Amino acid sequence: MPPTVDMGIPGASSSVAVNPTRKRVLLAEPRGYCAGVDRAVETVERALEKHGPPVYVRHEIVHNRHVVSTLEKAGAVFVEETDEVPEGAIVVFSAHGVAPTVHAAAAERNLHTIDATCPLVTKVHNEARRFARNDYDILLIGHEGHEEVVGTAGEAPDHVQLVDGVAAVDNVRVRDEDKVVWLSQTTLSVDETMEIVERLRQRFPKLQDPPSDDICYATQNRQVAVKAMAPECDLVIVVGSRNSSNSVRLVEVALGGGAGAAHLVDWADDIDPAWLEGVTTVGVTSGASVPEVLVQGVLERLAECGFDVVQPVTTAQETLVFALPREIRSAR
């Protein structure tokens, strides 16, 4: 067994090849499915088992093309809005969460709803409602148009201002500088979010933090693993779809952490052989909505190109499991 060595970041270790010139893959651990994604995907699968197709799903259940395609083949029908769902039918809300207006629209059509919102997103929704009840200005750090941001803002539309990047800080206006709090989208870059928070705090010294971290444990863990291996990587390949915020952030983290290059791929066929020219060490990770089968496909493709040594870079162990929505627990 190759030796285990310190990777230079607390808690990170890797089995590193004795010959540093041999082509190798550093494989980030943890990677792939988080507890919220696992719960959401299983929710649709169990709903199909219990009720039979079609089961309607508002928006992509998670941001991954492979997952959506697989569920479509099983009988899931993905729609943009609830008015596309036949009255009285079953509809699943995606892991990203929805605004109260969506619940109301579903009720008007007598839809049978199953809410697959990630519990960590629900936590942010609850925070938004609580601070709005106390008449705070809520500065929501996130990406404009992202489903999660739309849902969270919809919980308190009269109190929430979106802060999309450091440049947006200068445009923020509040009513009372003593009653300002920041919340965030759960899938952001930790470093970028903290940069925005510090800039906000320069403007509003009494800015309050959320009661607990809004950026989810899985997002943070995957970014830490990428940071651990990035300095040793000529190239980092992130498996994930382009509309997946947390996957895109992993590319940014890899580049910021010292990787020579970083690319986002949906699957192995997206790998450009030119990326591998002159490369000795390739880092591989995947976003929180990516099934492991897609990572294995990438590893097989890299092995065909001579990268047949795979060494883990482990920074955390994940054991969290979320209970399924009560509407479909009996289907287990």
UniProtKB/Swiss-Prot annotation:
Known catalysed reaction(s)? Answer: isopentenyl diphosphate + 2 oxidized [2Fe-2S]-[ferredoxin] + H2O = (2E)-4-hydroxy-3-methylbut-2-enyl diphosphate + 2 reduced [2Fe-2S]-[ferredoxin] + 2 H(+); dimethylallyl diphosphate + 2 oxidized [2Fe-2S]-[ferredoxin] + H2O = (2E)-4-hydroxy-3-methylbut-2-enyl diphosphate + 2 reduced [2Fe-2S]-[ferredoxin] + 2 H(+)
Q: Which Gene3D superfamilies match?
A: 3.40.50.11270, 4-hydroxy-3-methylbut-2-enyl diphosphate reductase, catalytic domain
Which residues does dimethylallyl diphosphate bind? 63, 96, 146, 244-246, 289
Catalytic activity, EC: 1.17.7.4
**Residue sites binding (2E)-4-hydroxy-3-methylbut-2-enyl diphosphate per the record:** 63, 96, 146, 186, 244-246, 289
Q: Which Pfam families match?
A: LYTB (PF02401)
Keywords, comma-separated and alphabetical: 4Fe-4S, Iron, Iron-sulfur, Isoprene biosynthesis, Metal-binding, Oxidoreductase
Task: Quote the record's binding site residues for [4Fe-4S] cluster.
Answer: 34, 118, 216
Q: Which cofactor does it need?
A: [4Fe-4S] cluster
Co-factor binding details: Binds 1 [4Fe-4S] cluster per subunit.
Identify the metabolic or biological route this protein is part of.
Isoprenoid biosynthesis; dimethylallyl diphosphate biosynthesis; dimethylallyl diphosphate from (2E)-4-hydroxy-3-methylbutenyl diphosphate: step 1/1; Isoprenoid biosynthesis; isopentenyl diphosphate biosynthesis via DXP pathway; isopentenyl diphosphate from 1-deoxy-D-xylulose 5-phosphate: step 6/6
State the active site.
Answer: 148
Signal peptide interval: none
Q: Where does isopentenyl diphosphate bind?
A: 63, 96, 146, 244-246, 289
> Which GO molecular function entries does the Swiss-Prot or TrEMBL record give?
4 iron, 4 sulfur cluster binding; 4-hydroxy-3-methylbut-2-enyl diphosphate reductase activity; metal ion binding
Name the Gene Ontology biological process terms.
Answer: dimethylallyl diphosphate biosynthetic process; isopentenyl diphosphate biosynthetic process, methylerythritol 4-phosphate pathway; terpenoid biosynthetic process
Alphabetical list of NCBIfam families matching this protein = ispH_lytB (TIGR00216), PRK01045.1-2 (NF002188), PRK01045.1-3 (NF002189), PRK01045.1-4 (NF002190)
Question: Which family would the database say this protein is a member of?
Answer: Belongs to the IspH family.
The record describes the protein's role as: Catalyzes the conversion of 1-hydroxy-2-methyl-2-(E)-butenyl 4-diphosphate (HMBPP) into a mixture of isopentenyl diphosphate (IPP) and dimethylallyl diphosphate (DMAPP). Acts in the terminal step of the DOXP/MEP pathway for isoprenoid precursor biosynthesis.
What protein is this chain from? 4-hydroxy-3-methylbut-2-enyl diphosphate reductase
Organism the protein comes from: Mycolicibacterium paratuberculosis (strain ATCC BAA-968 / K-10)
Upper lineage is:
Bacteria, Bacillati, Actinomycetota, Actinomycetes, Mycobacteriales
| Underlying gene | ispH
